[in-house]
C-alpha cells in the first residue's frame, strides 16, 4: 500500500442505550442530527477537511443503516483506490467471532488494517460527537511537542467533570495525571475521546493490553494510564470550539436547539469547513399561506401548513393545518396531522402523528419512536400516552 503519514480510526459501534427508542434499530453514530445529517458525518467531514483520506470505521451494534449511509464514502471524497473509507466489523475467527471488548480491543483487532498503510501516526476518534475540528493542527501540535500521545481536551463545567476522563497538566500542556470518570474531579479538563498516537508505540501497548486478562481493553481505563505510568510523553491539545457528546436524549435535543441560537458556535453554514452527508434530491420546501415559521431550520422537501417555532424539521416532514410545533426536533418523513400540539419533543423518522394529538408540553423531552403511529386524539406527556 505504501506509506501514509496518518490513518484515522473512528469508533462507531456504540449502542447508545441512553438514547432509548432512537437507537433501537440503529447505531448511535447513525442517529439523524441538524435537519440533514447523521452524527457520523462530523468526524468523517473533519477527516476530509483535514486532508486525512485513509479512514477505518469500526462498526458493531445494528450497523446496517450506518453502513448504507457511509457506502463507498463519496460525499466525503473518500471513494479512493488508495486509502479511502473502510467499514471494519469485529474480526471473525474460525472458532467464531465476538464483539469488540473495548475501545482498545477494537483497534487491536484491526492492527493488520492499519499496518497495510505503514503510518507514522494513528488518529483515534469517537463516532458520536458533534463538533468541527482541524486534525492537521492537532497533528502539528503532536509533532512540535515530540509526544508519544496527544489527547484532545476541552474545559467542561465542574459539576459535569465526573462524566469524563479528566487530566491534570503542567504549563506546557504535558499530562502528569489522568483519571477516568473520577467521583471527585481534580480539574475540569476533559478528554474529548480524540487521540493521536505514534503508531509503533501504540501497537506495543495494544498487544500488551490484550495479553493482560484483567484489562478492560479501554483507552481511558487501561492504555492511557499504562503509558503515563511508564513515563511516556503525553500532552493535552486544548480545543475551544463547539463540542457536544450527544449520548443522551437531553444532549441530543439541546445540540439541535443550539443550531437555532443567533450566536451558534457550530455554524453549519461555514463554507470553509463544510459538513458533508448523503442526501437524496428533494423538492423545495413549501410553506403554506396560513403557516407561520420563526427561528427554525426547515429542510428541503418539507410541507408546512401550521406554526413552527424554534424547531428543526428534517427532510420530507409534513405539518398539518392549525398544528403548533415548538422547541422540537422532527426527523425525516414524519407526518404531523391537523390540530396537533408538539412541544419540547423529538419525533423519529417516518413517525405518524394523527390529528388532534398533544405531545410534550411537560418538563421532560417527549420521544416518539421511528415509524411509530400516535393515534388520533392521543395525549403524550412525560412518556405516558392517554
From Swiss-Prot:
Q: Which residues cross the membrane?
A: none
Q: Which reaction does it catalyse?
A: alpha-D-glucose 1-phosphate + ATP + H(+) = ADP-alpha-D-glucose + diphosphate
Give the keywords, sorted. Answer: ATP-binding, Carbohydrate metabolism, Glycogen biosynthesis, Glycogen metabolism, Nucleotide-binding, Nucleotidyltransferase, Transferase
Indicate the quaternary assembly: Homotetramer.
What the protein does?
Answer: Involved in the biosynthesis of ADP-glucose, a building block required for the elongation reactions to produce glycogen. Catalyzes the reaction between ATP and alpha-D-glucose 1-phosphate (G1P) to produce pyrophosphate and ADP-Glc.
**Which family is this protein grouped under?**
Belongs to the bacterial/plant glucose-1-phosphate adenylyltransferase family.
- Protein name as it appears in the record: Glucose-1-phosphate adenylyltransferase
The species this protein was found in? Clostridium botulinum (strain Alaska E43 / Type E3)
Gene expressing this chain: glgC
Amino acid at each position: 500500500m505504501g506509506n501514509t503519514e496518518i490513518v484515522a480510526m473512528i469508533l462507531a459501534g456504540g449502542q447508545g442505550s441512553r438514547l432509548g427508542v432512537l437507537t433501537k434499530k440503529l447505531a448511535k453514530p447513525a442517529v439523524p442530527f441538524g435537519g440533514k445529517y447523521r452524527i457520523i458525518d462530523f468526524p468523517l467531514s473533519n477527516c476530509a477537511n483535514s486532508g486525512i483520506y485513509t479512514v477505518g470505521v469500526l462498526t458493531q451494534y445494528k450497523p446496517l443503516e450506518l453502513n448504507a449511509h457511509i457506502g463507498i464514502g463519496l460525499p466525503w471524497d473518500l471513494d479512493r483506490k488508495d486509502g479511502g473509507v473502510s467499514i471494519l466489523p469485529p474480526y471473525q475467527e474460525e472458532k467464531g467471532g465476538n464483539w469488540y471488548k473495548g475501545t482498545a480491543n477494537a483497534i487491536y483487532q484491526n492492527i493488520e488494517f492499519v499496518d497495510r498503510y505503514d503510518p507514522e501516526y494513528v488518529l483515534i476518534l469517537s463516532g458520536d460527537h458533534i463538533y468541527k475540528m482541524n486534525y492537521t493542527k492537532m497533528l502539528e501540535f503532536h509533532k512540535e511537542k515530540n509526544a508519544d500521545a496527544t489527547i484532545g481536551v476541552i474545559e467542561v463545567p465542574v459539576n459535569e467533570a465526573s462524566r469524563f476522563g479528566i487530566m491534570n497538566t503542567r504549563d506546557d500542556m504535558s499530562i502528569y495525571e489522568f483519571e477516568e470518570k473520577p467521583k471527585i474531579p481534580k480539574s475540569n479538563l476533559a478528554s474529548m475521546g480524540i487521540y493521536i498516537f505514534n503508531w509503533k508505540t501504540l501497537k506495543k501497548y495494544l498487544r500488551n493490553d490484550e495479553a493482560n486478562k484483567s484489562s478492560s481493553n479501554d483507552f481511558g481505563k487501561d492504555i492511557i494510564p499504562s503509558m503515563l505510568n511508564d513515563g511516556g510523553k503525553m500532552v493535552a491539545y486544548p480545543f475551544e470550539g463547539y463540542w457536544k457528546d450527544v449520548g443522551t436524549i437531553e444532549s441530543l435535543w439541546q445540540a439541535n436547539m443550539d443550531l437555532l441560537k443567533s450566536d451558534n458556535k457550530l455554524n453549519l453554514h461555514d463554507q470553509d469547513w463544510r459538513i458533508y452527508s448523503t442526501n437524496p434530491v428533494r423538492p423545495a420546501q413549501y410553506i403554506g399561506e396560513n403557516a407561520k415559521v420563526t427561528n427554525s431550520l426547515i429542510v428541503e422537501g418539507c410541507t408546512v401548513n401550521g406554526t413552527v417555532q424554534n424547531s428543526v424539521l428534517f427532510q420530507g416532514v409534513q405539518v398539518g393545518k392549525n398544528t403548533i410545533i415548538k422547541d422540537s426536533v422532527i426527523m425525516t418523513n414524519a407526518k404531523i396531522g391537523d390540530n396537533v400540539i408538539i412541544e419540547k419533543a423529538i419525533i423519529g423518522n417516518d413517525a405518524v402523528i394523527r390529528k388532534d394529538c398533544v405531545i410534550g408540553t411537560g418538563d421532560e423531552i417527549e420521544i416518539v419512536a421511528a415509524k411509530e403511529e400516535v393515534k388520533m386524539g392521543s395525549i403524550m406527556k412525560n412518556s405516558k400516552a392517554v
